[in-house]
């Protein structure tokens, strides 16, 4: 019997190619044009995006990227490449490709790379621990568009999410314990997830529940009293209500109420990026300290940590 060759496609959001206004504008144009991300009427959205948002936000966001850019490139790309390389080293007989929903390398190039290596079955692992229509479903949509152009399509196994997978929780818990060992146990552990519009949740996106699932399992694994852990949502965009409580407002409130030591983990980010390294590690640190807090640490994403790579090995094992 013919044995079909299996490959793994690691998918993530994407990043500008350079920390310049032009590169950021190209990236934001593609990202904010996806109806899975912003579902506003195109008649209203296009003029606003092209005439107001891109011209104003691109230079501002480029400066933020410049503050976290690494010698090898964008943090998200650097850590994603390291994940790809580490997983490939761990699974030498399984091709591993990296594709981004926006920017490069594209999901299309990742699929073509795997097909060129003789892969007949692709295990798609979107590196979003908690499902959302604006992230995981966007990967699904793009994958469908790519395969619609192929005469012969490969078999596909699509991993929807892994919010409460034991290996993911184990890796998160280990990273928290390591931070506690270095900095001491904080008064409060804040779990900050990327937000989505509240309307998306009202319409059936189960993202908030998947965040609660991760929080519940992590608190249990750490053995912390529930009152010493809070779950918040960051990175809101636009004027409509997003999931609450908001991370920045919560940190301000905690500082004002006398909380002195906080550590922040972002369980929804598989790799460090602008939203963690700048928004959480810098901006929100300032918010907390200016409100009266005294000690604040950001716990890094799992990135290419050994336990994270082992999770990917075990998560994809049933499909290989």
UniProtKB/Swiss-Prot annotation:
The biological pathway it contributes to is:
Porphyrin-containing compound metabolism; protoheme biosynthesis; protoheme from protoporphyrin-IX: step 1/1
Q: Which SUPFAM superfamilies match?
A: Chelatase
Q: Write down the EC number.
A: 4.98.1.1
| Species of the source | Klebsiella pneumoniae (strain 342)
Q: What does this protein do?
A: Catalyzes the ferrous insertion into protoporphyrin IX.
Q: Where's it found, cell-wise?
A: Cytoplasm
Give the protein name, as stated in the record.
Ferrochelatase
Print the keywords alphabetically: Cytoplasm, Heme biosynthesis, Iron, Lyase, Metal-binding, Porphyrin biosynthesis
* Catalytically driven reaction(s): heme b + 2 H(+) = protoporphyrin IX + Fe(2+)
Source superkingdom: Bacteria
